[in-house]
């Protein structure tokens, strides 16, 4: 509807809604997820700034965090959320949770029949997932790895991910990698310019065009 209203269907760009399960929406809140999905949202992100892992890395008050795993198991509310994601054939995004939590959540999601799973910018230092673990997630659970144009290093500084992304794509294969910008910051190019630079970089460094524009 956004494209239809704003652009009058004059382009082929499609925008999908989402919900992020931070403290502001009640954390792991099945009711909020249910409403979002019934309104047309296609992606459910686990906590970002409210994730325990994020708040630990930022030395913030953990009493305000949203936990997704306790004692090695997903919290009961997350099971309800995963059921909704499965039933609506939506996408689960792991957001800013820790690598060990990602494995627990992904395994539970697959066991419950969730088909579409994106591991959110695993290269970012807040998430900090090794290449080996990323490869293992793809091998064991057939997830999609989101790899971003640049990553926030704190203090308004951003680091290019292009070389590292290229290496991973060559290792894991293009079918299990989703590229995006994670842009919108004044320090980075406009998202469409960043994405064009990203695509061209991959082509210039040996990734076939039919894979880049798959």
Task: Give the positions of each predicted feature.
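Charged helix-capping and loop-helix junction motifs
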Residues: 30, 75, 130-135, 158-166, ...
């Amino acid at each position: 509807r956004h494209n239809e209203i704003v652009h009058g269907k004059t382009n082929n760009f499609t925008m999908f809604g989402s919900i992020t399960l931070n403290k502001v929406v009640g954390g792991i809140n099945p009711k909020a997820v249910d409403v979002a999905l019934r309104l047309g949202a296609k992606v459910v992100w686990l906590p970002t700034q409210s994730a325990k892992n994020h708040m630990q890395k930022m030395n913030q008050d953990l009493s305000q965090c949203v936990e997704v795993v306790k004692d090695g198991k997903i919290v009961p509310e997350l099971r309800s959320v995963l059921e909704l994601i499965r039933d609506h054939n939506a996408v689960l995004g792991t957001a800013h949770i820790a690598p060990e939590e990602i494995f627990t959540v992904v395994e539970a999601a697959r066991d419950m029949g969730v088909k579409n799973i994106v591991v959110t910018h695993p290269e970012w230092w807040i998430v900090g997932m090794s290449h080996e673990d990323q490869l293992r997630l793809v091998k064991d659970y057939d997830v999609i790895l989101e790899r971003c144009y640049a990553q926030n290093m704190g203090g308004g500084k951003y680091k290019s991910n292009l070389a590292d992304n290229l290496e991973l794509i060559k290792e894991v294969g293009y079918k299990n990698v989703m590229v995006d910008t994670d842009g919108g910051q004044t320090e980075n190019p406009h998202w469409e310019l960043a994405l064009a630079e990203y695509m061209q970089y991959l082509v210039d460094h040996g990734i076939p065009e039919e894979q880049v524009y798959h």
